[in-house]
Structure formats: structure tokens, C-alpha cells
């Protein structure tokens, strides 16, 4: 039996960034009744760290369905448009060493941040970006699950912007240099 139903295209990563998707829905068929249990199809994820003002105007995501499903509508891609995109901009800021912290370092290692400052790009509403200062940007290096050996290592930093209703985000991937030193074992009895 050919089940056929019209479904919404699903949510693309949505924080406080308003968007619309075209087409809003697809007609999909499946060879069995599995459509009855499908609430939505995810068509993709938008990585905000790669979303610059250039792509805020229009972004295209390919439409791929699970094996066995057929796209009756025929649309091969979805266009994502962001509301107020013309009011978004980006600026560069310098994050100081005091705003870079390490978490989840293994007990048998000492880890020190060597990077004194890091130049980063922030994308967001122009008024919010203009009010942002370097001291409002924090970098965190989470070493959970990272295999460490003594020496110099470049690790990816995750960023947080101070504020409760921040609609801005970091654009790009940033590495911080750390020095890893193995702690001497305590041999005292």
C-alpha cells in the first residue's frame, strides 16, 4: 500500500532567529504505513558558526528523505530566508586570556592557556553587535574525552556571549594553544 501525506519540512536550528522555509511542506509517499508515525522530516542543520551575513539573505538546503520514501512534490531543495537579515552584521573582537577557561582537565595533567588573545567574529543584529564589548565574550575549552599527552596542543574553543537574550553568535572555528604538563606521581608513603 502506498501511504501518502503532506508534512511540514521540520525545524531548522532556531534560537531567536526567525526564518521561513519554501516550500513549507512536501507530499511524501512510503511503501508501508511508516508515514503514520512520522511527525516531521529533518532536512538539515544550520551550523551557526558557518552562518555569515552573506548567507542570511537566502540559504539552500538539499531535501533528502529516508530510503524507501518518495518525494512526490519533486522539490530537491528548500530555501531558508531569515527575517530582518538586512539588520544583521558582523564585527571582530579580541578575546583576552582572562576570558579563556579550561574545564574537565584530567587530574594527572596541568593545563595552561598559552594564547594571550584571540581575534573572533560575531554575527548578529547590528544594534546588539554595536553594544557588545570584548569583555562580554568568553571562551571555554572542554577537555572531556580529549586524549592528552605532554606538550603543546591546539584545541577548539566554544564561546558564550554575556546576556540573557543574546541573538548573536560566533562565526568561524577558533583554536587556542595550551601547554600540557604531566603531573609527577606522588611516591610518598
How would you name each of these model-derived features?
Residues 1, 6-189:
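Structured interface patches
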Amino acid at each position: 500500500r502506498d501511504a501518502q501525506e503532506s508534512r511540514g519540512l521540520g525545524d531548522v536550528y532556531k534560537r531567536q532567529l526567525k526564518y521561513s522555509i519554501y516550500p513549507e511542506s512536501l507530499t511524501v509517499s512510503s511503501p508501508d504505513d511508516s508515514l503514520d508515525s512520522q511527525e516531521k522530516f529533518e532536512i538539515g542543520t544550520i551550523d551557526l558558526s558557518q552562518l555569515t551575513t552573506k548567507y542570511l539573505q537566502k540559504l539552500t538546503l538539499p531535501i533528502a528523505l529516508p530510503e524507501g520514501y518518495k518525494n512526490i512534490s519533486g522539490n530537491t531543495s528548500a530555501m531558508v530566508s531569515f527575517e530582518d537579515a538586512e539588520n544583521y552584521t558582523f564585527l571582530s573582537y579580541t578575546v583576552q586570556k582572562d576570558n579563556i577557561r579550561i574545564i574537565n582537565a584530567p587530574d594527572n595533567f596541568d593545563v595552561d592557556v598559552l594564547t594571550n588573545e584571540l581575534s573572533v567574529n560575531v554575527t548578529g543584529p547590528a544594534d546588539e553587535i554595536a553594544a557588545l564589548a570584548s569583555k562580554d565574550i568568553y571562551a571555554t575549552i572542554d577537555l572531556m574525552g580529549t586524549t592528552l599527552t605532554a606538550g603543546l596542543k591546539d584545541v577548539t574553543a566554544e564561546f558564550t556571549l554575556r546576556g540573557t537574550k543574546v541573538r548573536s553568535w560566533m562565526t568561524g572555528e577558533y583554536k587556542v594553544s595550551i601547554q600540557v604538563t604531566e603531573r609527577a606521581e606522588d611516591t610518598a608513603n
